[in-house]
């Protein structure tokens, strides 16, 4: 007699031809799985949502919607969470289309290398999560064809309720193939294929080999698996919304099975009442100093609470069972992953136990077949009400992997690729981004990397660089961009007075001109902001006279408030005045002498690059406007001219995607910044979305960022930037952002200790640690590292 076998069951080593007992599937037909025990189930794949991207109200609505689903769902259901290597095939297909249409050699090379890089991450590090709901057939039919017709109604109802709470269910072109491939991952992990099997079920699912003799793991076709469960008393007393999220993000090789079993109210209420009464009677006999007094008191209160919620609030009573599958390629790696999941459970208040001598039973319980073993279920079941069951909501993922986005790098939480689609308005209320990072953290590197990848996807990019603009030149010119240097000694010039459009109607190219607002008056507002920067002491009287001088200057060129005066008979825009043309009109007013002298420095003096006619082609798809060569007193002026030009360019149409990148935004909004110029930038940030554009700002001086007007500029910019990237920061600056973004202590510490090129990516309440990744060609074009540059010079 073997005592171990009597106590724990007999684990048999299955050899070829003896592994069929592991497969409880009899047949698959019409999207239905027929089991050998006579039961039927159907499986629906559910696409997750970024729960923490939602507002608090949206989160509550999602949980309420999921509770409504549970109310209408069958009494028993299973939720499966699988971790798999990331599937980035759709993203790579898009890169291929960009590669085929790209003419610039360097861009083609970078697109090719990016595709290789993303594919490498997906194969070696990248993970994705798949979510499934398993529903049983509860009707009376016995034939699978009849079952398929009836269970389809159940699946349709479930789909409608899930969609009502924001979840989308996947509709596969061939449901039977989907189910076969899903099950192959469990039974034949290294034989999974998208093709239909050559043999009939269940032979097609039967593993070639399986070893179930181990007390702590089984081995299916060389894949080692161990099974753990959350013990019935191992759950926290109170849980928050989406409390199942930590399990979802557990990491590589971790799958989760949640089984919910609803109990009849008529059956469960008497049990709850009797148990509460029994515990109350025991409480009378227990002194309040005994160790178990509080446990009994809590049990009484819990029983009364559950009874009240069921009777008065209409909640249902469920048993929840959670089984965790850990997979690895060796017993050593399996043990390491087991330790990780045990630590994760402990850190989140859960008590996790290993299913020793029950691994084969746990294996069957974890299959997406709703076949939980009775022993496993009794050891792991926990009673919960509808509200707590709905709050489980495991269909939440920290992944940021948009199919049509820009590749950022690696998600350090779960090793998935980070791909962000700034233009997806269904996911992000706006695609604007604020980037923070101390000197040397990789801020400029990231900005250029983002800009080049946007350019490679057909986005028109404008970069404004008030500091160290030369760092952008090499990459800009290598991809066919236009580098514009605005400053002393430069021949490049942009005329602020130039009017570049004949209507303010952004939709005029599609629906005709319906907006008669004066383009001239709109331009004059910008000119006045420029003079506020140029001559901060200007008085209201001087502003009035300046206004007259500007109007008279435009009138001399045949331009009035009437938009029709902007073009000649051929329909082309007329020649526009510049500051050199404005000076004679200003000199007619002696009261403007001081203002005129300030302007003359831009026309005749050392800063003449700011006052002449536009002499460069500004229609390139990638433009860098470098104002860093200007002296400190003119930096804000040059940056404003560049920003005003960009606003002009992006507001012509909203058909094409555009991106505006402003580095060192504190130059405009810092302590010595100009409030009107800051308001101009804020207005641009607020309106770019309507132009089909995004605005990306960056700074290494967080304190200065919030210095102007008690932080008005910084707050407005953060409030209108759905995405934030926090690279490494000094402690004082990280603490400042902690207040503004409500970061936790651990998140703040993470930002302070981040390595170069690492940071915290925030999208709403969803925050992930990310490592920026570039290809070799991108790195060579972007890097400002002295040693890397020296190596390149030596090589050349």
State each model region's role:
Residues 2, 22, 32-33, 44-50, ...:
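P-loop NTPase motor domains
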């Amino acid at each position: 007699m073997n005592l171990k076998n009597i106590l724990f069951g007999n684990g048999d080593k299955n050899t070829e031809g003896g592994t069929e007992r592991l497969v409880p599937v009899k047949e698959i037909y019409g999207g239905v799985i027929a089991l050998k025990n006579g039961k039927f189930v159907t499986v629906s794949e559910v696409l997750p949502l970024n729960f923490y991207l939602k507002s608090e109200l949206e989160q509550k609505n999602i949980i309420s919607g999921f509770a409504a689903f549970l109310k209408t769902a069958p009494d028993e259901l299973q939720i499966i969470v699988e971790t798999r290597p990331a599937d980035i095939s759709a993203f790579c297909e898009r890169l291929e289309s960009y590669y085929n249409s790209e003419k610039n050699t360097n861009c083609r090379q970078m697109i090719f290398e990016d595709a290789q890089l993303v594919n490498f991450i997906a194969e070696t590090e990248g993970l994705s999560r798949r979510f499934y709901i398993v529903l049983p057939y509860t009707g009376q039919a016995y034939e699978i064809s009849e079952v398929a017709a009836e269970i389809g109604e159940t699946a349709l109802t479930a789909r409608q309720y899930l969609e009502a709470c924001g979840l989308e269910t996947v509709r596969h072109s061939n449901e039977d193939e989907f189910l076969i491939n899903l099950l192959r991952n469990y039974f034949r992990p290294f034989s999974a294929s998208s093709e239909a099997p050559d043999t009939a079920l269940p032979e097609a699912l039967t593993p070639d080999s399986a070893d179930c003799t181990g007390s702590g793991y089984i081995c299916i076709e060389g894949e080692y698996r161990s099974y753990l469960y959350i013990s019935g008393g191992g759950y926290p007393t109170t849980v928050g919304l989406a409390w199942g999220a930590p399990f979802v993000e557990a990491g590589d090789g971790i799958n989760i099975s949640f089984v919910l079993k609803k109990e009849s109210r008529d059956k469960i209420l008497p049990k709850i009442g009797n148990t509460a009464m029994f515990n109350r009677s025991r409480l009378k006999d227990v002194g309040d100093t005994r160790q178990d007094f509080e446990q009994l008191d809590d049990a009484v209160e819990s029983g009364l609470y559950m009874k009240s919620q069921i009777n008065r609030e209409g909640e249902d009573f469920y048993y929840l069972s959670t089984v965790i599958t850990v997979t690895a390629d060796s017993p050593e790696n399996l043990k390491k992953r087991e330790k990780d999941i045990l630590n994760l459970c402990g850190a989140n208040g859960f008590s996790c136990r290993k299913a020793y001598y029950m691994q084969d039973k746990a294996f069957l319980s974890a299959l997406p077949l709703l076949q939980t073993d009775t022993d496993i279920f009794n050891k792991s079941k926990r009673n919960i009400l509808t509200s707590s069951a709905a709050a489980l909501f495991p269909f939440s993922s920290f992944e940021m992997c948009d199919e049509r986005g820009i590749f950022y790098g690696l998600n350090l939480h779960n090793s998935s690729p980070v791909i962000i689609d700034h233009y997806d308005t269904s996911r992000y209320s706006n695609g604007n981004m604020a980037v923070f990072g101390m000197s040397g953290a990789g801020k400029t590197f990231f900005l250029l990397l983002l800009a080049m990848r946007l350019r490679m996807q057909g986005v028109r990019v404008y970069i404004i660089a008030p500091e160290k603009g030369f760092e952008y030149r090499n990459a800009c010119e290598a991809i066919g961009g236009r580098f514009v240097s605005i400053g002393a000694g430069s021949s490049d010039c942009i005329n602020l007075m130039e009017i570049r459009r004949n209507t303010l109607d952004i939709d005029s190219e599609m629906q005709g001109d319906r907006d008669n607002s004066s383009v001239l008056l709109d331009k004059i507002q910008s000119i006045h902001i420029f003079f506020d920067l140029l001559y901060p002491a200007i008085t209201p009287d001087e502003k009035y006279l300046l206004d007259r001088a500007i109007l008279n200057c435009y009138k001399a060129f045949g331009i009035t408030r009437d938009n029709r005066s902007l073009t000649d008979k051929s329909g082309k825009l007329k020649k526009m005045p510049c500051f050199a043309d404005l000076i004679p009109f200003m000199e007619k007013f002696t009261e403007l002498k001081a203002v005129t002298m300030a302007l003359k420095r831009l026309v005749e003096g050392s800063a003449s690059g700011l006052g002449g006619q536009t002499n460069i082609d500004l229609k390139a798809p990638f433009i860098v406007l470098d104002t860093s060569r200007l002296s400190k007193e003119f930096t804000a002026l040059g940056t404003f001219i560049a920003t005003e030009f960009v606003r002009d360019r992006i507001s012509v149409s909203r058909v094409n995607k555009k991106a505006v990148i402003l580095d060192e935004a504190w130059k405009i909004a810092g302590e010595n910044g100009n409030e009107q110029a800051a308001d101009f930038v804020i207005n641009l940030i607020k309106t770019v979305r309507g132009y089909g554009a995004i605005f990306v700002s960056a700074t290494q001086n967080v304190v200065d960022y919030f210095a102007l007007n008690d932080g008005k500029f910084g707050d407005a910019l953060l409030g209108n930037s759905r995405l934030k990237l926090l690279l490494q920061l000094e402690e004082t600056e990280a603490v400042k952002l902690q207040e503004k973004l409500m970061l936790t202590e651990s998140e703040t510490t993470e930002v302070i200790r981040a390595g170069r090129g690492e940071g915290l990516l925030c999208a709403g309440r969803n925050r992930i640690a990310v490592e920026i990744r570039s290809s070799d060609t991108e790195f060579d074009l972007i890097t400002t590292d002295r040693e890397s540059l020296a190596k390149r010079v030596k090589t050349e």
